[in-house]
């Protein structure tokens, strides 16, 4: 109700720090009732920057997004949104894991949002703990808890494994431990390690683009445009293990994202221009 009352004097609304599953319903209702962009940053900002980083990491290790097997640990707002966006950009094999284990149809402990994702993921119907699910996977994405992944768990993943350990301030596994386990590319949410996965790469540009286009919504297609805009900033020649995502203070990012998002808004007809 508060957001609806203040909306007439703003060009867009950025939601922050709303836990799952409430965040899904609140954002859905606001998007239906307002004619300005509404964007829950903890969901979509995280999903966009993770997807951009994974596009480049997968390219660097010589694999393809449609072929990789991914485990996402943490089936809250960020984990579910990351999963949805990865499916949108063509990843075919994702398993979500929460405290009680892998999300799979029939598990009684899941909330409605998790039950929905269980129907769309986990093709092999894997049940069990994070350690069991990680076996043979190409990519680990963590938006969960500190220190829950070991070097041994990473060593059981596929060759040239990619590890995005984004629990803050202490990651699921420290970069040196992940490397010890055989990870080829490691990213965290911290600025004192290479490959920082930070929402600041997303929301300034995505809102600038939406406002420039006078967009009434931020659609899935606009989010995907932002993913590729961020990933494309790093050229094939620049791409390396410790540089798969632009830095948080790279001035090119917001402009590049804004242009891509505004262009897509006009193409989709959600622009008032």
Where are each of the predicted segments found?
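Glycine/serine-rich phosphate-binding loop and adjoining beta1-alpha1 elements at the start
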Residues: 1-68
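General beta-strand structural signal in soluble alpha/beta enzymes
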Residues: 14-17, 38-41, 72, 96, ...
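A cross-family phosphate/adenosyl-ligand binding-site feature
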Residues: 22-34, 41-44, 104-125, 223, ...
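Rossmann-like adenosine-cofactor binding region
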Residues: 115-184, 190-192
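Conserved active-site and cofactor/substrate-binding residues in soluble primary-metabolism enzymes
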Residues: 1, 21-25, 45-49, 73, ...
